[in-house]
């Protein structure tokens, strides 16, 4: 085993995975250290092929967990508090943290390979020029040392790799990017969007910009990623690799170089 590394990265979540990909593709011998357990992509910890009746209590956690104070932070986010995804989150009773009484903080963590990249919401929104200029115009803090124009090519670089499904909406407050086929709105969503457009010129209801593949590129399929089937089981892990995570995208890209340990 080679113990000489050019780069050592602590953590394999979204940031760590990206760092590993970029360093490995530039020829650096890279070591990634993860505090949590290994989670194999498409392995048994992914529950996306299990039917409701295959899950413990059909996905509802046991009442004793709440009674004994387990997963307090996660219980406040009810949509994630399910047995099919509980193992991807940290139990804050076992790993407590503190914060000032007047500044409560909900720290959602995942201690495993891929970290929170397995459970993030996948909404990918660019900052607009307004976001970079707002504090200077409002007189708060200091001006940003960079502007939107500096980041725009890097936004594009990331979007092309991860795959973002969205419309080009032409909004000043939300710049368009490198998008794949957008999801269609439901009839109810379209009805609301149309009525907002009739009554307001400065308010918009748009389809989300999600890091779920709808038209995979050759680069993405070469990594083993497939098209999203819209099953709404994302929190269980995606065996198709359709949503962006360290397991589905950046770490496989890093492994392909032969420079990752």
Locate predicted features.
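Core beta-strand elements of the Rossmann-like FAD/NAD(P) dinucleotide-binding domain
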Residues: 2-5
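N-terminal Rossmann-like FAD-binding beta1-loop-alpha1 element of flavoenzymes
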Residues: 7-32
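Glycine-rich, histidine-containing beta strand-loop boundary motifs that form or position
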Residues: 12, 34-36, 43, 122, ...
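Short glycine-/acidic-enriched loop or helix-start segments at secondary-structure transitions
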Residues: 19, 42-43, 217
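Glycine-rich FAD pyrophosphate-binding loop
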Residues: 24-46
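Short, hinge-like loop/turn segments at secondary-structure boundaries
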Residues: 48-51, 224
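Conserved redox-cofactor binding core of oxidoreductases
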Residues: 56-91, 96-106, 111-112, 120-126, ...
